[in-house]
């Protein structure tokens, strides 16, 4: 398939620049893969489409204030964007840097009160590896000196409101540089309604990386290579998902990040495996889903890996038809936009 097969016209004014006043106030489009029909609804009523016994798998990653503004030891201004923590006991991160002259290994960075960095060897362009020095807890230091990294299509500076609204209500594990945005619609009240209906809600963690915004640069989508992201599947989640599959109950993934993690961590026998690792799975049409029966997701960019993923689940023509309808109905797109449920 060609990249152009996943293109569509999107008016700029439909790209949501701010969240709605209430999380659950978004609109919802429901796609039935069997009947090839779609319905328009309100997200607040999403529980109506769940059944007792369904398992909803959520990504509990927490967005960190990954944008750091500081200066090099020579005095020049530098912006450091944390992308992914590297394995090890020290806080060494793959980072993107923006400055007049790219820093070399050994360059010291002053990044705010109580936080310094040193550029170390390693890192394939455009990334630099930076080892951070600080007192206390790294995540708390970041909360004090870092800035929330809004996506590039949100054309404004982050505000204090984004610190809470660009997080899900179930965010627990710090490490993402972008939110798992399908989860932004959920409130504690909606989660309680789902539980009362008999829906199991199980967490996993995938720390969303900057690559989620990177465009595909190959016309043949099979040549695209996904970025790596750190993930963790708890024992309890693996057990709950495997029981559901054994019983013929549905597993519904909240977001493309949960989908990719579930389908990456499954073994040859179709059993979800608990544990940690790095995920670089690219799901495209022709992929055989072994865990995921349904998906809650936002409306994605044209020609993006995320749009390709939802097309793999629901069918390319059906998805593009749905997106055309969403544009006509003036649905809001991308991170702070409206929502889709694929069943």
From Swiss-Prot:
Pfam family membership, one: Queuosine_synth
Subcellular location per the Swiss-Prot or TrEMBL entry: Cytoplasm
Any one GO cellular component localisation term in the record: cytoplasm
GO terms of molecular function: S-adenosylmethionine:tRNA ribosyltransferase-isomerase activity
One annotated GO biological process: tRNA wobble guanine modification
Pathway(s) served: tRNA modification; tRNA-queuosine biosynthesis
EC number: 2.4.99.17
Enzyme class: transferase
Catalytic activity entry: 7-aminomethyl-7-carbaguanosine(34) in tRNA + S-adenosyl-L-methionine = epoxyqueuosine(34) in tRNA + adenine + L-methionine + 2 H(+)
Alphabetized UniProt keyword annotations: Cytoplasm, Queuosine biosynthesis, S-adenosyl-L-methionine, Transferase
Family indicated by similarity: Belongs to the QueA family.
Subunit structure: Monomer.
Protein name: S-adenosylmethionine:tRNA ribosyltransferase-isomerase
Organism: Syntrophotalea carbinolica (strain DSM 2380 / NBRC 103641 / GraBd1)
Gene: queA
């Amino acid at each position: 398939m060609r990249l152009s097969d996943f293109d569509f016209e999107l008016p700029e004014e439909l790209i949501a620049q701010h969240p709605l006043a209430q999380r659950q106030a978004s609109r919802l489009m429901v796609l039935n893969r069997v009947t090839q029909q779609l319905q328009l609804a309100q997200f607040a009523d999403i529980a109506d489409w769940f059944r007792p016994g369904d398992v909803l798998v959520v990504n509990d990653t927490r967005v960190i204030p990954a944008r750091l503004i500081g200066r090099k030891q020579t005095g020049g201004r530098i912006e450091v964007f944390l992308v992914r923590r590297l394995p090890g006991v020290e806080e060494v991160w793959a980072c993107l840097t923006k400055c007049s002259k790219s820093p070399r290994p050994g360059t010291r960075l002053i990044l705010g009160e109580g936080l310094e960095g040193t550029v170390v060897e390693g890192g394939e362009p455009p990334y630099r590896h930076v080892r951070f020095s600080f007192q206390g807890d790294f995540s708390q230091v970041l909360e004090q000196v870092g800035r929330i990294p809004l996506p590039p299509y949100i054309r404004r500076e982050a505000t204090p409101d984004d610190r809470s609204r660009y997080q899900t209500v179930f965010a627990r594990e710090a490490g993402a540089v972008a939110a798992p945005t399908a989860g932004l619609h959920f409130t504690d009240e909606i989660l309680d309604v789902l539980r009362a209906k008999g829906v199991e809600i199980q967490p996993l963690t995938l720390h969303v990386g900057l690559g989620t915004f990177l465009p595909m640069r190959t016309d043949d989508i099979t040549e695209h290579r996904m970025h790596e992201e750190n993930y963790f599947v708890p024992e309890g989640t693996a057990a709950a998902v495997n029981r559901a599959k054994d019983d013929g109950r549905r597993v519904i993934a909240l977001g493309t990040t949960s989908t990719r993690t579930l389908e990456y961590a499954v073994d040859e026998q179709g059993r979800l495996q608990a544990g940690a690792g790095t995920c670089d799975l690219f799901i495209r049409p022709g992929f055989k889903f072994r865990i995921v029966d349904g998906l809650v997701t936002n409306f994605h960019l044209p020609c993006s890996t995320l749009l390709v993923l939802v097309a793999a689940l629901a069918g390319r023509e059906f998805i593009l038809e749905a997106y055309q309808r969403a544009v006509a109905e003036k649905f809001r797109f991308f991170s702070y936009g409206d929502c889709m449920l694929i069943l």
